[in-house]
Amino acid sequence: MGISSNGYSDDLGWNWRFGVWNQELTQTKSGYKGDHYQGEFASRLARTAWYDEASGGRGYIHLALSSSFGVPDGNSPTNNQARYRTRPEARTDSRWLDTGRIAGADRNSVFGFESVVNVGGFSWTSEYLQTKVERQPAFGPNVTFKGLYTQFAYVLTGEHHPWDRKTGTLGRLKPFENFFMVRDCDGCRQKGMGAWEVAFRYSHEDLNDDKEVTENNG
C-alpha cells in the first residue's frame, strides 16, 4: 500500500518519480522482519541528455539517480532482520550469493546511478547500486554492499532499442521483419530474419562487509 507520483518536463529532457509505501510483510520471503508498519520512501530523477529527433530516436543518452530509504520497524521479541541474496543472470536454481540473516536491521538505504548510451544499433547500458543497513548498536556495526553491471550490445539486423522519454525507460525492440515464415494479414507466407543482437555483459556484486558479514555461496 502506498502513494506515488511521476512526471516529466515539457521538453521531455527530465522525468521523475517518487513515492511512499508501507512495505509488504516479508517474513516468508527472506526479507525484512517486523510488525506490519514497514515504511519506505523511494525516488528516481532521470535526464535524457541527448535525443536525436532527426533519426526518430536512434541516438540518445540517458542518466539517472535513484534512492530509497526503509524502516523495518520490528517489534519484540522478533528483532528486525535483513537478508540479501541473488541468482546470476542465467537464473540458476540456487542463489549463488547470500548474506544470511543480518540481525538488528534498524534502517536500510539504497543509492543508484544508471546510464544508457545508444547510437543506431549499438547500445551501452550500466548501473551501480550501493545498499547500507544501519543496525541497532547491540547487534554490531552498520554494513554496506555494492553491485554493478555493464553491457555492450549491437543489433546485427539494423534495429535499435527505442527510448521512452516520459518514463526514462527502454522500449521493446521491434524487428523490421518477422522471423522465418509467418502469415501476413492476407494469409500469405512471408520470410524474414527477425531481429538478431549480440551482447557482452559483465556484472559484479559484493555481499561481503569486512566489519561483519561474509557472503555464503549457494
Could you tell me what each predicted segment is?
Residues 1-46, 50-55, 73-105, 184-185:
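Surface-exposed coil loops of outer-membrane beta-barrel proteins
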Residues 18-20, 59-71:
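Extended catalytic-interface subdomain
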